[in-house]
Amino acid sequence: MAAIDIQVSLRGRYRGHVPINVLDPLRQCALEIGQAVVEHRGRGYSGVRDTQYHLDLAADEVALRVLGGAEFRVVSEESGVSGAGEYTVVVDPIDGSTNCDRGVPFFATSLAVMRGDELVAGLVMNQATGSSFEAEKGAGATRDGQSIVPSGQTEVGKSIMAFSGLPPRHLGWAQYRALGAASLEICLVADGSLDVYGVAQHSTLNPWDYLAGLLILREAGGVATDYRGEVLDTSSAVVRRPVFCATPELLDRMVSVGAI
């Protein structure tokens, strides 16, 4: 879909305060990013900024072009704030850049749409497989067009947990993972592949890493809290926050036994 077509659709039909086709430019953006990074994988760091890869710059260039053409304001991990518009897209062009550059097949494009301080839509595409998680506020969550729900696991001792960083201790899990792409790991909690995802204590995530995934998680029936077990605030496109994700029952159980 051309950028001009997307502009017209966003100015047209609405569901509440959300354009009917708000996910269309996000899909186009993710697909074009996937195509763009192929030739840059394995090139290493860009030298522009610490831990920034050549593939990050290539992906960001695509994101700014596609999203700017759709008249979004953009908040990107790679280039900061650009453009203007009623809707803001918070984007991590490639979440899991090291995985992508080194050939580990677990990395994603994360795109969250905000209207003011309200999170209204999100898309996370696994660029290694092409699988796509999507949600609009109040409309449920899907993976490749099929509705998703969390695992329903309620026992800490039977849970498969994933973390960003090293947990302070064994938290009673059955199995543990560290996969390296937060947005995608949150989505795997949303569809029941994982039971829990969290950051190590005293760590936080940037909003481009968690906003899209958290909307998908919530629309699927999961919850996200901070370390105190309080519901996570998703009203800011720039504030880093601690994140813990699971089903409501499992998070309550983890808090009660001191696992978080």
Label every model-predicted segment:
Residues 1-94:
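N-terminal subdomain of lithium-sensitive/metallo-dependent phosphomonoesterases centered on the IMPase/IPPase/PAP
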Residues 30, 148-260:
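An extended, acidic
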Residues 42-46, 71-74, 141, 173-180, ...:
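Short secondary-structure junctions
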Residues 56, 96-97, 189, 217:
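Buried hydrophobic positions in well-ordered alpha/beta secondary-structure cores of metabolic enzymes
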Residues 73-78, 91, 100, 178-180, ...:
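General beta-strand structural signal in soluble alpha/beta enzymes
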Residues 79, 139, 146-147:
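Well-ordered beta-strand scaffold positions
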Residues 85-138:
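DPxDG-like acidic metal-binding loop motif
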Residues 115, 143-144:
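Structural motif
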